[in-house]
């Protein structure tokens, strides 16, 4: 009898001829996530990935594998050659363990017969195993609708018995859908936006704008911390830091005060696009959401968008703030995002930012600036940091 983790994936199954490419990537990422935990054997077999584990105490492995995009759910299971008597006994033992640990009183057996040569059909298996459990326990009842514990039995090339399903985030394996550059502020939204795009298999890198020395070192470190949290899902991220201060000063001097935010945002987009093109990213990602702040009106988004040609992915565009916050908590970025450090956008915060900008007017203001020179100089001073899971 062996202890294994069964790792299931969802959407990859629909990939037709490309399925094996996606499976290979997923297996590689799962291996990468656990490689420093010792000699952990990870392998793919019959449209699932398995990990051999010493015992059921595989919490750390499960915690990490759960974060690998593409993983739908994980079950710690026992595997053994197909033998119905052993199946019944193992199911009984697992229920007894649940009774001892959690005091469960109701259960249901869910069986699956994949090997059609096995003589009992799935419902017959469930009935017999359920009957055997009832005969050999006291105070336990079957509840088919809302059981406290489900005992899963599978008859495939081997038998599997388990009681737990730990859910991952689904999505597609990282690196199966190209590369994008995330505009990563220290706020709540952009880390969530990057996470959502990465979940679709896109390798992401980050670009942060600061106004040092008006913004502090600690504010920059906060963004590095956020990028580190993202690497627990994405493995590694290159973080590009750009000082926007010279640009902001120039806008402040030459353009109408109320256009500061929208003009700065257009510079951010242009700089990000320039760097994205250099490093092979085919899209930008932002945490913008309609109506959330003054610059995120539909007109504001239009004017921001018009600064670049690359596609801009805004996965939060129609989400409410509370839902974004919930997701931030789920992916562990929230607590870091709410730390009170200043952002470059607050350095020259206009009293009444324009909320309904007209593109022609913004372009006229922009023409007062040496856009090209300012961009080149900001990129020239850019810093790059390679952040990876192994950094600690
Ligand atoms: N300093 C920055 N560095 C990098 N990107 C930024 C910066 N400030 C804003 N952005 C990008 O522009 C988007 C909109 O920023 P804005 O400040 O208008 O909204 P927000 O709701 O506060 O966003 P966030 O919560 O992500 O900071 C951000 O989600 C981010 O993608």
Swiss-Prot record:
Pathway: Cofactor biosynthesis; thiamine diphosphate biosynthesis. The keyword Nucleotide-binding applies. Gene3D superfamilies: 3.30.2130.30, HUPs. GO terms for molecular function: ATP binding; CCA tRNA nucleotidyltransferase activity; tRNA binding; tRNA-uracil-4 sulfurtransferase activity. InterPro entries: Rossmann-like_a/b/a_fold (IPR014729), ThiI_AANH (IPR020536), ThiI_fer (IPR054173), ThiI_N (IPR049961), THUMP_dom (IPR004114), THUMP_ThiI (IPR049962), tRNA_STrfase (IPR003720), tRNA_sulfurtransferase_ThiI (IPR050102). It catalyses: [ThiI sulfur-carrier protein]-S-sulfanyl-L-cysteine + a uridine in tRNA + 2 reduced [2Fe-2S]-[ferredoxin] + ATP + H(+) = [ThiI sulfur-carrier protein]-L-cysteine + a 4-thiouridine in tRNA + 2 oxidized [2Fe-2S]-[ferredoxin] + AMP + diphosphate; [ThiS sulfur-carrier protein]-C-terminal Gly-Gly-AMP + S-sulfanyl-L-cysteinyl-[cysteine desulfurase] + AH2 = [ThiS sulfur-carrier protein]-C-terminal-Gly-aminoethanethioate + L-cysteinyl-[cysteine desulfurase] + A + AMP + 2 H(+). CDD domains: PPase_ThiI (cd01712), THUMP_ThiI (cd11716). Its EC number is 2.8.1.4. ATP binds at residues 183-184, 208-209, 265, 287, 296. One of its GO terms (biological process) is thiamine biosynthetic process. Pfam families: ThiI, ThiI_fer, THUMP. It is found in: Cytoplasm. Belongs to the ThiI family. Catalyzes the ATP-dependent transfer of a sulfur to tRNA to produce 4-thiouridine in position 8 of tRNAs, which functions as a near-UV photosensor. Also catalyzes the transfer of sulfur to the sulfur carrier protein ThiS, forming ThiS-thiocarboxylate. This is a step in the synthesis of thiazole, in the thiamine biosynthesis pathway. The sulfur is donated as persulfide by IscS. This is Probable tRNA sulfurtransferase. It comes from Alkaliphilus metalliredigens (strain QYMF). The gene is thiI.
């Amino acid at each position: 009898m062996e202890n294994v983790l069964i790792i299931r994936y969802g959407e990859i199954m629909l990939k037709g001829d490309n399925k094996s490419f996606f499976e290979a990537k997923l297996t590689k990422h799962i291996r990468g996530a656990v490689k420093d935990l010792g000699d952990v054997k990870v392998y793919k077999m019959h449209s699932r990935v398995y990990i051999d584990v010493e015992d059921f105490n595989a919490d750390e492995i499960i915690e990490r594998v759960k974060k690998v995009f593409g993983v739908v759910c994980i079950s710690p299971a026992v595997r053994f050659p197909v033998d119905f008597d052993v199946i019944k006994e193992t199911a009984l033992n697992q229920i007894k363990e649940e009774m001892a640990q959690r005091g469960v009183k109701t259960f249901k057996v869910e069986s699956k017969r994949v090997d059609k040569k096995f003589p009992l059909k799935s419902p017959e298996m469930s009935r017999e195993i359920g009957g055997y459990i009832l005969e050999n326990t006291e105070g336990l009842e079957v509840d088919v609708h809302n059981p406290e514990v489900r005992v899963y039995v599978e008859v495939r090339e081997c038998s599997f018995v388990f009681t737990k399903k730990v859910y991952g985030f689904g999505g597609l394996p990282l690196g199966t859908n190209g590369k994008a550059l995330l505009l990563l502020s220290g706020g709540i939204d952009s880390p969530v936006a990057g996470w959502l795009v990465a979940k679709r298999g896109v390798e992401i890198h980050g670009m942060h704008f600061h106004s040092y020395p008006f913004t502090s070192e600690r504010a920059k470190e906060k963004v590095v911390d956020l990028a580190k949290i993202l690497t627990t899902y994405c493995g590694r991220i290159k973080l590009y830091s750009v000082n926007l201060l010279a640009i902001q000063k120039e806008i402040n001097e030459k353009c109408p005060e109320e256009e500061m935010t929208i003009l700065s945002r257009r510079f951010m987009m242009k700089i990000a696009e320039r760097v994205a093109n250099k490093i092979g990213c085919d899209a930008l990602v932002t945490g913008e959401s309609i109506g959330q702040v003054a610059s995120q009106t539909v007109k504001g988004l239009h004017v921001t968008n018009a600064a670049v040609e690359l596609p801009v992915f805004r996965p939060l565009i129609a989400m409410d703030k509370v839902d974004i916050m919930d997701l931030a908590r789920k992916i562990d970025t929230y607590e870091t995002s709410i730390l009170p450090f200043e952002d470059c956008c607050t350095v020259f915060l206009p009293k009444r930012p324009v909320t309904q900008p007209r593109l022609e007017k913004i372009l006229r203001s922009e023409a007062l600036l040496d856009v090209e020179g300012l961009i080149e100089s900001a990129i020239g001073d850019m810093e790059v940091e390679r952040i990876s899971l192994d950094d600690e």
